[in-house]
């Protein structure tokens, strides 16, 4: 995997991979120990022609023009696009080793005025919310460079903020000023308006035609209320679920942009508290990642986020940089209890909360010897998981009283599978 898949793979700060987390830095051999972009490295790649200046939306895709169908080793080589808002330009990788710029200030061809959201598909189509010009700009990547295709929406849009393609020829656009989601064809024909929102921001759409999605639901995820509320809608605009970001364990949350992974988990950048919030496809809260700062696993005013669904490669834009992660997993709750029933029926209940699907080996040990292997390589679902041990050893005999250790070794099922694992344990006193 070559590091310049990211829009900023201007990346300069190097570390070896650490412990397993919900988002994890890739191992050294995949990134040469590089996972974070800086302005000095951007200058090295492009010359002193631009700086990170109000980064906004990010998009990633695997270009068909780059694909060699006879070589699956290149399937993780992505094209990434990032909006450099105050410079009215797009930063993108022209190859796996070089960056390019597209756009300048203005209202004509190849020009932008305070662009915000961006979305792209494998065929090479790229759409930008040219917010200040009240339009959508359509450009095309032929595998070598970006070229102008046209613009549309000027007669309808007031403040286009973010957009999301379906890969079926339709584009969903949030209009913050109108409180709507506008649906267009790739050719710019207006299909319909979905109303009832208040200052919508980020948007992400699932669709059966989207490359590498597990479910392929016809579903829209949108940040409403200036980023305070995350909603799930069907394609008719009917609300299916919603969650107030201020009800999760954070204060003053303000969601910026959204990305979906392979399983339709919803990842939301929150610039107010320097975190990324993760929800499942039904908008049940899973976890929050990060804190304010510029060290590892910290964020500085996170804005855009993009995930390549097939492998979980994740890019997060910040005030003056970007970070590159893989989707991992974590166990954030590990509790045990003994049921208060008759002795012959007593069991130990193991209660876990898992932030992404995981493979787990679960063993009961006495003085470091395994007395019971509950699971050897069990796939566990995301969220709350309950496992019971009947207090018997591998031979089916009731274990004698004493202190036992329950040990769990788990690893991700997604992009980082085979590269990371984590072992946790707890003691329990069996009467």
Residue map of PLM features:
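Short loop/turn segments immediately following the C-termini of beta-strands
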Residues: 85-86, 131-132, 176, 225, ...
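Glycine-centered tight-turn motifs at strand-turn-strand junctions
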Residues: 370-402
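A short helix->beta-strand "capping" segment at the edge of beta-propeller domains
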Residues: 18-55
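Short loop/turn segments that connect beta-strands within beta-propeller blades
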Residues: 94-97, 140-144, 185-189, 234-238, ...
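Beta-rich, blade/repeat-based domains predominating
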Residues: 48-77, 108-122, 154-166, 197-215, ...
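Blade-level signature of beta-propeller repeat domains, shared across WD40, Kelch, NHL, RCC1
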Residues: 297-338
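A short beta-strand motif characteristic of beta-propeller blades
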Residues: 41-49, 99-109, 145-154, 189-194, ...
């Amino acid at each position: 995997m070559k590091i310049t898949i990211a829009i900023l793979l201007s990346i300069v700060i190097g570390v070896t991979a650490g412990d397993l987390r919900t988002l994890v830095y890739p191992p050294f051999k995949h990134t040469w120990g590089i996972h974070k972009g800086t302005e000095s490295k951007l200058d090295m790649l492009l010359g002193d022609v631009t700086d990170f200046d109000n980064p906004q939306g990010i998009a990633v895709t695997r270009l068909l023009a780059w694909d060699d169908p006879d070589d699956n080793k290149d399937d993780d080589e992505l094209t990434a696009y990032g909006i450099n808002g105050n410079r009215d330009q797009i930063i993108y990788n022209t190859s796996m080793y070089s960056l390019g710029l597209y756009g300048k200030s203005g209202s004509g061809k190849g020009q932008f005025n305070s662009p915000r959201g961006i979305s792209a598909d494998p065929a090479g189509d790229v759409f930008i919310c040219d917010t200040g010009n009240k339009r959508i700009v359509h450009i095309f990547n032929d595998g070598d460079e970006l070229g102008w295709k046209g613009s549309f929406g000027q007669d309808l849009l007031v403040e286009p903020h973010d957009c999301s393609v379906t890969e079926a020829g339709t584009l969903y656009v949030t209009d913050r000023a109108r409180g709507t989601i506008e649906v267009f064809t790739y050719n710019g024909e207006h299909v319909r308006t979905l109303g009832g929102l208040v200052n919508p921001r980020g948007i992400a759409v699932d669709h059966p035609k989207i490359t590498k999605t597990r479910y392929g639901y016809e579903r829209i995820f949108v940040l409403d209320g200036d980023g305070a509320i995350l909603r799930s809608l069907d394609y008719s605009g009917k609300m299916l679920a919603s969650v107030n970001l201020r009800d999760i364990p954070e204060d003053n949350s303000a969601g910026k942009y959204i990305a979906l992974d392979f399983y339709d988990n919803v990842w939301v950048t929150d610039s107010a508290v320097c975190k990324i919030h993760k929800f499942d496809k039904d908008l049940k809260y899973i976890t929050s990642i990060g804190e304010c700062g510029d060290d590892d696993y910290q964020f500085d005013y996170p804005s855009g986020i993009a995930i390549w669904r097939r492998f979980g490669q994740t890019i997060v834009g910040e005030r003056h940089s970007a970070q590159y992660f893989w989707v991992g997993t974590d166990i954030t709750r590990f509790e045990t209890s003994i049921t208060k029933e008759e002795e012959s029926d007593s069991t130990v209940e193991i209660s876990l909360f898992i932030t992404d699907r995981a493979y787990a080996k679960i063993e009961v040990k006495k003085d470091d010897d395994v007395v019971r292997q509950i699971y050897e390589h069990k796939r566990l679902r995301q969220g709350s998981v309950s496992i019971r041990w009947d207090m018997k050893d591998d031979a089916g005999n009731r274990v004698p009283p004493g202190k036992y250790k329950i040990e769990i070794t788990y690893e991700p099922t997604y992009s980082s599978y085979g590269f990371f694992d984590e072992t946790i344990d707890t003691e329990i006193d069996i009467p």
